């Protein structure tokens, strides 16, 4: 038995005999900078652990480490019907989740397209729209009405502070939203008021982050799940810590939240290493950071998330073409000069090209960028995409290893979601290999820590958290800070 995990990613077996010595020479420093050794990964993990600890301290640190106020592990025996909503960038998702009590569930969902003006509408327009969609959904599912109020979990993936699980004070809008009168205020009573107006029996019992939802949903179905992870446009992790090991909660919890109580932590660790201490940044990473809307922030995210993979490739290609005059000679580079013109689909398609002459890459550059490529150029493009994808995957596991080592997990299922995890070629195999490199597990044993596909965090996760919260509230237990 060897590993039984994903096999290492296959690199293209092609010769570089037709690639010019000058181009091969230019590739060497890129290969050196983007190849991350096992020793370097272990050093990053060690620093990551100290940053996680700092985030939990009273003084705080780069990583926010936000208590999620989920203080019970799901057992898988939870039952009942729960609503969940997820306010995305283009639609509102409404889900009815029926928890079966045997680590099983059944879902019914609808998506409601957001009107074009909604992201800059008034506060009342937003909440009234959500309430109207909820009423339409509930009336269809329960034409004869509900016998008792439906508990609702609200996935709100915008920066919000919480002193208890059934509140969320919006810090600032992101993702193109800009509605006046909501920032700095608790969104839960606003939604509850709108729901009351339409006369539908719904109680908003929990407001959650999607990563915390991923953690809890996966724990409901998988007793080995220890972590929820997002690898997509953003990166994040969530896990359960213990109240007594969270110094910033010292003296702030009610007496019915004992020191041994578990506490879900939404890490928001895209901000790891904002002080530029450990991550080996290239000049391309520095340029991306300096030209970003928030320089100096989200350092870790900018080196691994899907949003930046294509931009790193674009910057290297532009340097090879414009400064070094090694590729795309005599071509119009106007489209290539547009920042972020190459999204994550570019390196993804480049790595997926199954043809020996990389004809898919040729089509991609011709159709999207107006650039005719030679076969040697395409080999270099492919090699660069592999280097960038490999680096992203290897960095991605550092948060996993750090949390496992911090909590003393020797075995774990780490439940992952997001476009990079689900769609980027080779990502699963590369992350599995990176974990082996960090831990140096024997080759003849099954990998004890593995990344697995997550359950639906914003739907099932929100519902399970609503179930756990409803149980606490019925028992008269606290769901937040002392006095909150």
UniProtKB/Swiss-Prot annotation:
Entry keyword set: ATP-binding, Cytoplasm, Glycolysis, Kinase, Nucleotide-binding, Transferase
Compartment annotation: Cytoplasm
EC number of the protein: 2.7.1.1
Region (Hexokinase large subdomain), start-end ranges: 209-456
Pfam families documented for this protein: Hexokinase_1 (PF00349), Hexokinase_2 (PF03727)
Molecular functions per Gene Ontology: ATP binding; D-glucose binding; fructokinase activity; glucokinase activity; hexokinase activity; mannokinase activity
Other comments on record: Has antigenic properties. Elicits a specific immune response in systemic candidiasis human patients undergoing malignant hematological disorders.
Subunit (UniProt): Monomer.
Similarity comment: Belongs to the hexokinase family.
Identification of the protein by name: Hexokinase-2
Originating gene: HXK2
């Amino acid at each position: 038995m060897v590993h039984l995990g994903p096999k290492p990613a296959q690199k293209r077996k092609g010769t570089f005999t037709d690639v010019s010595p000058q181009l091969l020479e230019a590739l060497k420093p890129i290969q050196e900078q983007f190849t991350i050794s096992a020793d370097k990964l272990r050093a990053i993990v060690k620093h990551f652990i100290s940053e996680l600890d700092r985030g939990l301290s009273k003084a705080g640190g780069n990583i926010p480490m936000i208590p999620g106020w989920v203080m019970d592990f799901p057992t898988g025996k939870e039952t009942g019907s729960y609503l969940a909503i997820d306010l995305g960038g283009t639609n509102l998702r409404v889900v009815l989740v029926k928890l079966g009590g045997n680590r099983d569930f059944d879902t019914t969902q609808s998506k409601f397209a957001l009107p074009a003006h909604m992201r800059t509408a008034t506060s009342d327009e937003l909440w009234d729209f959500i309430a109207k969609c909820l009423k339409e959904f509930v009336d269809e599912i329960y034409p004869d009405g509900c016998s008792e109020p439906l508990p609702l979990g609200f996935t709100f993936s915008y920066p919000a502070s919480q002193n208890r699980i059934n509140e969320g004070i919006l810090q600032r809008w992101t993702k193109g939203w800009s509605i006046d009168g909501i920032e700095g205020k608790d969104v839960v009573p606003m939604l509850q008021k709108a729901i009351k107006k339409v006369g539908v029996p719904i109680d908003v019992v929990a407001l959650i982050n999607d990563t915390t939802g991923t953690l809890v949903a996966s724990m409901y179905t998988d007793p080995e799940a220890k972590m929820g992870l997002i690898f997509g446009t953003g990166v994040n992790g969530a896990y359960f810590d213990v109240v007594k090991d969270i110094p910033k909660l010292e003296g702030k919890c009610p007496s019915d939240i004992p020191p041994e109580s578990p506490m879900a932590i939404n890490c928001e660790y895209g901000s790891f290493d904002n002080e530029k201490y450990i991550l080996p940044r290239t000049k391309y990473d520095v340029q991306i950071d300096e030209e970003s809307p928030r320089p100096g922030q989200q350092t870790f995210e900018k080196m691994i998330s899907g949003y930046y993979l294509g931009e790193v490739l674009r910057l290297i290609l532009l340097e090879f073409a414009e400064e070094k005059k090694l590729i795309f000679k005599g071509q119009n580079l106007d489209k290539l000069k547009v920042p972020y013109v190459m999204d994550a689909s570019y390196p993804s398609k480049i790595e997926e090209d199954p043809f020996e002459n990389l004809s898919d890459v040729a089509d991609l550059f011709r159709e999207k960028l107006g650039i005719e490529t030679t076969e040697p150029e395409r080999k270099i493009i492919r090699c660069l995409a592999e280097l960038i994808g490999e680096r992203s995957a290897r960095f991605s596991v550092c948060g996993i290893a750090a949390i496992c080592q911090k909590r003393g997990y020797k075995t774990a299922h780490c439940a992952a979601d997001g476009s990079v995890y689900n769609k980027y070629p080779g990502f699963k195999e590369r992350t599995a290999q990176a974990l082996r490199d960090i831990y140096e597990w024997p080759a003849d044993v099954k990998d004890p820590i593995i990344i697995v596909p997550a359950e639906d965090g914003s739907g099932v996760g929100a519902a399970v958290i609503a179930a756990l919260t409803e149980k606490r509230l019925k028992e008269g237990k606290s769901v937040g800070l002392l006095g909150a």
